[in-house]
Amino acid sequence: MVSVQINDNESIDKMLKRFKKKYERAGVLKEFRKKAYFVKPSVDGRLKRSRSRRRAQRANEERNS
């Protein structure tokens, strides 16, 4: 769990900004979305391969440009 202590003379906005940064770096939201519903292993593998292919294609296009 992500927690942030408010420092002396620190505004709420700064504290919230620090919390948001820690929250994003911890990957809490990403993990929550990933576990929101069940994905069959076969479908998960298919999606991973598809993402990998797309990433490789983009990298190849950048190298050729």
Swiss-Prot record:
<dbReference type="GO" id="GO:0005840">
    <property type="term" value="C:ribosome"/>
</dbReference>
<dbReference type="Pfam" id="PF01165">
    <property type="entry name" value="Ribosomal_S21"/>
</dbReference>
<dbReference type="InterPro" id="IPR001911">
    <property type="entry name" value="Ribosomal_bS21"/>
</dbReference>
<keyword id="KW-0689">Ribosomal protein</keyword>
<dbReference type="GO" id="GO:0003735">
    <property type="term" value="F:structural constituent of ribosome"/>
</dbReference>
<dbReference type="GO" id="GO:0006412">
    <property type="term" value="P:translation"/>
</dbReference>
<dbReference type="InterPro" id="IPR038380">
    <property type="entry name" value="Ribosomal_bS21_sf"/>
</dbReference>
<keyword id="KW-0687">Ribonucleoprotein</keyword>
<protein>
    <recommendedName>
        <fullName>Small ribosomal subunit protein bS21</fullName>
    </recommendedName>
</protein>
<comment type="similarity">
    <text>Belongs to the bacterial ribosomal protein bS21 family.</text>
</comment>
<dbReference type="GO" id="GO:1990904">
    <property type="term" value="C:ribonucleoprotein complex"/>
</dbReference>
<feature type="compositionally biased region" description="Basic residues">
    <location>
        <begin position="48"/>
        <end position="57"/>
    </location>
</feature>
<feature type="region of interest" description="Disordered">
    <location>
        <begin position="45"/>
        <end position="65"/>
    </location>
</feature>
